[in-house]
């Protein structure tokens, strides 16, 4: 499987006309046991961070070996081994574990400080986390230096910081940098880079990456791959194909499935037709409990309220606004949502007072609206 993934990445990069010089850190460069004397005498970038030096199938053995070494090391040597363990975890996308190790390490030497910075930055970027107020700027990171995967890390930082211009400058060579990463990182990051290429309309790279997805069934069949195919079709103006594929992705449970439901709702609201709105209502209602918490749940409820309102179903719209207030009372949007709900309630009770609802339906609705 490891060779299959690597060959697939290389094939895609050849289609993208990535220079052969960036295809470094092939599996033959990996080492079972880190020889730091050799690394220190070699390329600095590999000394800072090289996730491909770890065997993709050797987590248990590598970890056992590193733990055994820890017992016999002291001082700077122990720090070095702990950073090796953090890098090992990162190579397998165990980012929480890698971050926990790094939090316990206090590097003393310039070389160790540099490596600690590179590892810490890599954990943040692979996790997709934006920098905090105390995070040093990326351009001071070892990952921004003379590395074959510099554009890869720069693109992840641009995505995390919403820097569209820097992302546009780095997205194309970032696919070359992706080839220097282990398969666990490729699986995790390929959808992120593909989405960036879609939004930047880098069609040649999008087409090649979508073909690569076809050779990785675990991604192609996942909601992420399905959603991104739909988004690519939508970006190219093929709304019918996009809607069909979005509906497939919306049947899942992860964040890409939620985003597919939101996309279906947005397309229906833009269309305005009753059939499209009813389809969006069904999609949103069917998945309203599939994702709880955070901005995605809030966005689903907001879209559902808008769809109800567009269909003239103000009672369900106001009840949905009530759900939002119950679920997210501390959000900044709470005050305008409450005002919107009060306005809709006034309209509903005015209509009820004017006899626009059958008496039995009005009584049942009134009971539902009671706090």
Where is each model-derived feature located?
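Post-signal peptide N-terminal segment of secreted/secretory-pathway proteins
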Residues: 67-133
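Helix-turn-helix repeat elements of alpha-solenoid scaffolds
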Residues: 53-64, 90-101, 122-135, 159-172, ...
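Gram-negative bacterial Sec-dependent N-terminal signal peptides
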Residues: 1-35
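Residue-level recognition of tetratricopeptide repeat
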Residues: 87, 120-122, 156, 195, ...
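Generic helix N-cap/helix-start motif at coil->alpha-helix transitions
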Residues: 42-46, 76-82, 93, 109-117, ...
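Glycine- and small hydrophobic-enriched segments that form the cores of compact globular domains
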Residues: 106-112, 116-162, 166-169, 177
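Solenoid-like repeat scaffolds
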Residues: 33-40, 67-76, 103-111, 136-148, ...
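N-terminal leader/linker segments that initiate helical-solenoid repeat arrays
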Residues: 24-80
């Amino acid at each position: 499987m490891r060779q299959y993934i690597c060959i697939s990445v290389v094939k895609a990069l050849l289609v993208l006309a990535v220079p052969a010089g960036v295809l470094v850190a092939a599996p033959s460069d990996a080492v079972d046991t880190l020889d730091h004397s050799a690394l220190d005498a070699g390329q600095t970038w590999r000394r800072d961070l090289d996730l491909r030096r770890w065997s993709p199938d050797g987590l248990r053995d590598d970890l056992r070996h590193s733990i055994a070494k820890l017992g016999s090391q002291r001082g700077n040597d122990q720090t070095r081994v702990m950073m090796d363990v953090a890098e090992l975890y990162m190579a397998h996308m165990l980012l929480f574990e890698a971050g926990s190790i790094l939090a316990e390490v206090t590097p003393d030497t310039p070389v160790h400080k540099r490596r600690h910075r590179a590892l810490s930055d890599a954990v943040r970027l692979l996790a997709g986390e934006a920098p905090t107020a105390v995070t040093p700027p990326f351009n001071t990171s070892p990952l921004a230096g003379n590395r074959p995967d510099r554009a890869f890390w720069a693109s992840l930082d641009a995505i995390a910081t919403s820097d569209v211009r820097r992302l546009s400058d780095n997205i194309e060579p970032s696919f070359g940098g992706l080839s220097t990463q282990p398969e666990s990182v490729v699986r995790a990051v390929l959808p992120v880079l593909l989405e960036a290429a879609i939004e930047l309309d880098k069609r040649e790279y999008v087409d090649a990456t979508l073909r690569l997805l076809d050779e990785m069934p675990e991604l192609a069949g996942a909601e992420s791959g399905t959603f991104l195919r739909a988004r690519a079709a939508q970006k190219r103006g093929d709304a019918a194909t996009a809607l069909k594929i979005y509906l497939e992705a919306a049947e899942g449970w992860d964040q890409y499935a939620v985003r597919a439901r939101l996309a279906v709702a947005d397309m229906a609201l833009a269309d305005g037709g009753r059939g499209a709105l009813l389809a969006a209502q069904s999609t949103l209602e069917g998945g309203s409990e599939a994702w709880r918490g955070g901005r995605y749940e809030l966005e689903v409820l907001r879209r559902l309220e808008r769809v109800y309102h567009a269909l003239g179903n103000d009672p369900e719209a106001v009840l949905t606004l009530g759900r939002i207030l119950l679920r997210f009372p501390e959000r900044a949007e709470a005050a305008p949502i409450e005002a919107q709900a009060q306005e809709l309630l006034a309209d509903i009770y005015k209509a009820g007072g004017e006899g626009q609802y059958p008496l039995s339906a009005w009584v049942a609705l009134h009971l539902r609206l009671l706090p």
